[in-house]
Amino acid sequence: NKYYKTNEVTWVDEAQMFKIIDRAETIEPLMIGSKAPNLVLRDTSNFIHNLYAINKDLTMLIFYDPDCGHCKEVVSDVKQNYDEWLNNGISIEVIAICVELDRDKWIEFINNYDTGDWINVAEFKTYVDGEFNRQNDPYVTPFPYVKQIYDINGTPKIYLLDKDKNILVNSIKGNIGVDQLSEIVENESKE
């Protein structure tokens, strides 16, 4: 990023340079070791959850679309591992963030994949005719902003955070398998 911003790169045209710099600025706050941006979203009971208020050694964020086949597979695998982690005394919270703005599909997904013991959040209330209305719900993170700050351009996307909400894993579309993710969770819980 520093070379592109200082015009030290001469082989890229201006339009491409803008795209490269813009992309670098988007992903920079999501690098491993960075503090994850806060999320404040509502669950199925309309209760507000604040990411920074979660008091667990590990927090896993799973961004998913209920119509995504790979999301279904990943959520099912994580759920199986989650139950084992809890049985082994691992202090972890899973926050499942639905990116599809269809409440019925969201609820059906939670029921079908038995994720009721996770924090299941999405944001529907703040939309009026497809537009975000801050006056409707001033307490939550606007969903287009959530997708932007977490760089959600495909699903599933998983972040694993430590107790201070620093990013340990940033995985898009399963580039880290659930087995590897489980190994990281188990290793981090021993530290």
Annotated model-derived regions:
Residues 128-186:
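Thiol/disulfide oxidoreductase modules built on the thioredoxin-like
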